[in-house]
Amino acid sequence: MSIKLKQRFVPQLAAINYQFEEDFSKMLKTVDTSHIKEKTVVKGQVIEIKNDMIIVDVGLKNEGRIPKSEFLSLPEVGDVVEVFIEKIEGRNGRTILSREKAVKEELWGQLEIMCSKGEFVDGTIFGRVKGGFTVDLSGVVAFLPGSQVDVRPIKDPTSIMNIKQPFKILSMDKKLGNIVVSRRVILEESRSEARDEMLSKIKEGMILEGVVKNITDYGAFIDLGSVDGLLHLTDISWGRVNHPSEVLEFNQKVKVMVIKFDEKTKRISLGIKQLDSNPWDAIKEEFPVGKKMTGKVTNFADYGVFLELKDGLEGLVHSSEISWLKSNQNPRKMLTIGQEVEFIVLEVDTEKHRVSLSIKQCQENPLIKFAENNPIGTIIKAPIRNITDFGIFVVLGNNMDGMIHEGDISWEDNGTDLLKSYKKGDEIECKVLAINFEKEQVSLGIKQLSPNPYQKISDEYKKGTIVKAVVTEIKDDGLVVLLNNKVTGFIKRVELSDEKDEQKPEMFQVDEEIDAKVVSIEKSTGRVLLSVKAHKIAERQKTLKEYGSSDNTTNMGDILANVLEEKK
């Protein structure tokens, strides 16, 4: 059953308000209805409620129908309501009205006024879209860009959704129906006053409570209410912390101390470890240098391994202090996390908060024992562990190796070629040549088991001796010569003459005899190095010394001419 009003309703513009409903019809008779246009808001009277529809008369030829769902509270027959005219005459000749759009039009007008005055509007974030969020402004949907959500990135946006909160309108476009709002502007304005007030009270040494707002590799930012402070990684604990996330969580409440405040930049440095006494104050007494202790492996680094000395305190064993004989090996290959090892305290640096430890010094240095039993010159037998391009490694016991360089295999033959005649596992005899305790190396030799065949040559051809040499081979870099038909010598190109244009090997012939001075002897090969240039210079100096004291009128040319004549 429906209730219908018999009296016709006369149109009225939305701008006109009447105090009494009973005068409504009479007043409308004098109003010009030609102003009623589509896409405008007008007042209308509810004349009938039928099923799910509200029938409204706005004074036009036809009534309009509006779904009940568009009304927040249902009107009664006779009530005057504001409606939006979609079309004066739509399909079937009916006027198309909307209560929802009328409300939005009214709200849009209110929002425009608030925007022009810079006033805040209440809204609720209810959805996520590309680039930001959607906000319900009591029926009008606005866009909240991601950059305008907060003063800092928010990891969990659900914490600010579906909550009524203030926003500031940044821009409005009625034609496009777009509204852009900001939450960040309000936060900045509200925080600004509180920030200035708090900064005026901040002092170093203050203890404050805050919330972890962001975690980075180098520390965490703590929200102190209206300002943020940085809690650096090194100020979290007196012990070792590899990453802040090991001990801190997002939104975790923490107690911190202001350890530094820069009044110019307004930067606040915070610390947690400063709330406790510095354990390093008593470290030197508790861990004296030379003390032998035990500890567990807690962490590895490229340069060594960390051991736990006690709760919250670690010491470093450098790679070179792990083993006497494996200083270059990866610590991870020698130790495991949680393994308990014995160590000695080497140094305690209270300023840098470092404790240096040694594992190897808890054990006897096997190299010292080897040196005591096998001094330099000792002949030993040892199996071959490995053969490389540059020599042979043999086993000396106690995980210790000795090395025979390829140059110490033979006096006369090529060591590189001789390496092929040895194989892994062969036991060979060799002599201890040198022991380097700093580098932890033992040098051995095979050729030193027999006398140096070139020592006799060194004794016979001493440096400075003038000898006669016969050319046996002409090379680009010099001449190969033979001394006394048994010893090989060599004259470098630059040693062929004291005149540069005569330093040419091709100027000599095979079997030509040359006078030269012994410069040196290669002990590894026994080859004698000679110099024609040095011999000529010595001859010239000798001549000048012999004839230089004669008549001063005699010139150099005369002296040399006389010498040459005498030699003929």
Curated annotation (Swiss-Prot):
<feature type="domain" description="S1 motif 5">
    <location>
        <begin position="377"/>
        <end position="447"/>
    </location>
</feature>
<dbReference type="Pfam" id="PF00575">
    <property type="entry name" value="S1"/>
</dbReference>
<feature type="domain" description="S1 motif 6">
    <location>
        <begin position="464"/>
        <end position="533"/>
    </location>
</feature>
<keyword id="KW-0677">Repeat</keyword>
<protein>
    <recommendedName>
        <fullName>Small ribosomal subunit protein bS1</fullName>
    </recommendedName>
</protein>
<keyword id="KW-0689">Ribosomal protein</keyword>
<dbReference type="GO" id="GO:0006412">
    <property type="term" value="P:translation"/>
</dbReference>
<comment type="similarity">
    <text>Belongs to the bacterial ribosomal protein bS1 family.</text>
</comment>
<feature type="domain" description="S1 motif 4">
    <location>
        <begin position="290"/>
        <end position="360"/>
    </location>
</feature>
<keyword id="KW-0694">RNA-binding</keyword>
<dbReference type="InterPro" id="IPR000110">
    <property type="entry name" value="Ribosomal_bS1"/>
</dbReference>
<feature type="domain" description="S1 motif 2">
    <location>
        <begin position="118"/>
        <end position="184"/>
    </location>
</feature>
<dbReference type="InterPro" id="IPR050437">
    <property type="entry name" value="Ribos_protein_bS1-like"/>
</dbReference>
<comment type="function">
    <text>Binds mRNA; thus facilitating recognition of the initiation point. It is needed to translate mRNA with a short Shine-Dalgarno (SD) purine-rich sequence.</text>
</comment>
<dbReference type="GO" id="GO:0003729">
    <property type="term" value="F:mRNA binding"/>
</dbReference>
<keyword id="KW-0687">Ribonucleoprotein</keyword>
<feature type="domain" description="S1 motif 1">
    <location>
        <begin position="39"/>
        <end position="100"/>
    </location>
</feature>
<dbReference type="GO" id="GO:0022627">
    <property type="term" value="C:cytosolic small ribosomal subunit"/>
</dbReference>
<dbReference type="InterPro" id="IPR035104">
    <property type="entry name" value="Ribosomal_protein_S1-like"/>
</dbReference>
<dbReference type="GO" id="GO:0003735">
    <property type="term" value="F:structural constituent of ribosome"/>
</dbReference>
<feature type="domain" description="S1 motif 3">
    <location>
        <begin position="205"/>
        <end position="273"/>
    </location>
</feature>
<dbReference type="InterPro" id="IPR003029">
    <property type="entry name" value="S1_domain"/>
</dbReference>
<dbReference type="InterPro" id="IPR012340">
    <property type="entry name" value="NA-bd_OB-fold"/>
</dbReference>
